[in-house]
């Protein structure tokens, strides 16, 4: 029997842990699969995905900066992908790509089950309004948060995200320069890529955003998360959490969509933490 082909698309993508995660899931469940990382710039993504499908690709994950492009080329969409306006999981069915988004489910599962957080009643600051932010915002609302304030370098994108979520009573956008006037939050989520240059000054956020319960969460992991988590610790946030757990949980959701079985995530998460010093330092 030929081995099924899967991949993660991004730009850049060489750093991705997804191939290792899905290889571990395959061993755990006894499912033979070939999962690789494919670097595709936005203008090359459609052609790269077509080649992948022609070569027998059955499913794909999509990371920055391609999630909104994946949304646009999906022949059909899950409800959560439609609300998010972004796709991180593609399933090949009847010669077409079906788009889904497992990011939000992965984040909520990591925060509530791995870290034991109760999201109900929390006031949330969401930094960013791109594909990553769009992926997690609907799931946070479903988890019972009280209010979400979206702040983005481009106010128009923040407004567009708020409009797409369709809950004006709970979701508002604010300007970056207004951060000092926003009050404090129980959850601060960094959904930007500002930490990629590892500049600690990129997250010189006001200390007034933090209260005694604040959990600061970076959707990135590894070196990219270090600057934001350093700020979180200096601000004495109760929790400083990187995106590794979310990555593993969203991968498990994708795996279940493709194979019909949800793998155990704790062994994979623990193994990744144990083997990589950068990941440990970003925890």
From Swiss-Prot:
Give the active-site positions. 67
User: Which UniProt key words apply to this protein?
Assistant: Amino-acid biosynthesis, Aromatic amino acid biosynthesis, NADP, Oxidoreductase
Q: Name one GO molecular function term.
A: NADP binding
Statement: the UniProt record of this protein carries the keyword NADP: yes
Share an example GO biological-process annotation for this protein.
Answer: amino acid biosynthetic process
- The record's top EC class is oxidoreductase
Q: Which biological pathway?
A: Metabolic intermediate biosynthesis; chorismate biosynthesis; chorismate from D-erythrose 4-phosphate and phosphoenolpyruvate: step 4/7
Highest taxon of source: Bacteria
Q: A cellular component term (GO) from this record?
A: cytosol
* NADP is among the record's keywords: yes
Subunit annotation? Homodimer.
> What does the similarity note say?
Belongs to the shikimate dehydrogenase family.
Protein task = Involved in the biosynthesis of the chorismate, which leads to the biosynthesis of aromatic amino acids. Catalyzes the reversible NADPH linked reduction of 3-dehydroshikimate (DHSA) to yield shikimate (SA).
Tell me the protein's name.
Answer: Shikimate dehydrogenase (NADP(+))
Q: Which organism is it from?
A: Xanthomonas campestris pv. campestris (strain ATCC 33913 / DSM 3586 / NCPPB 528 / LMG 568 / P 25)
